[in-house]
Amino acid sequence: MINVEIIKNYDKWREHKQINKSLIKKITQNVLLRFDNFSKIKQFELSILLTNTAEILTLNKQFRNIEKATNVLSFPSNELNWQDLYSKLEFLGDSDYIHLGDIAFCYEVIYNESCEQQKNFENHFIHLLIHSILHLIGFDHQNDTEANIMENLEIEILSYFGISSPY
């Protein structure tokens, strides 16, 4: 079971009814089921903030010391490493519950990127959601090898939902 809490702090998000708990649960489940280790976990929790430039700017400055708006910020609750996902369940202990973390999305940045890159807004959001969930479970893109692994997973998951590669 995946519990999703969504906070919409910006009215423009309400125009995108298809971005809802059901979609976020479906995407999250698709990502997690790719890793056998997560199949033993009974309950996952994820918090989503749908906000605007002012708030994402504040969060980015506060947590990353970067004074710039960004499309999405991921705040993992666990110190997971993607390589551990392929090993035994020891990295999770005996837990049957995991709070994956928090993700904050900025409407204006995502909207502008969608327009500039000629992408459907919802599809771009889904890509960013997948990308963020991968960050929450320990994936990163600090070097080319990590970036390739992460991008290939994103492309595979997007393809499952009928969305073409953003790369």
UniProtKB/Swiss-Prot annotation:
The keyword Acetylation does not apply. GO terms for cellular component: cytoplasm. Zn(2+) binds at H131, H135, H141. One of its GO terms (molecular function) is RNA endonuclease activity. It is found in: Cytoplasm. Its cofactor is Zn(2+). It is an enzyme of class 3 (hydrolase). Its EC number is 3.1.-.-. Keywords: Cytoplasm, Endonuclease, Hydrolase, Metal-binding, Nuclease, Ribosome biogenesis, rRNA processing, Zinc. Gene3D superfamilies: Metalloproteases ('zincins'), catalytic domain. One of its GO terms (biological process) is rRNA processing. Binds 1 zinc ion. It holds the Pfam family YbeY. Single strand-specific metallo-endoribonuclease involved in late-stage 70S ribosome quality control and in maturation of the 3' terminus of the 16S rRNA. Belongs to the endoribonuclease YbeY family. This is Endoribonuclease YbeY. It comes from Rickettsia felis (strain ATCC VR-1525 / URRWXCal2). The lineage of its organism: Bacteria, Pseudomonadati, Pseudomonadota, Alphaproteobacteria, Rickettsiales.
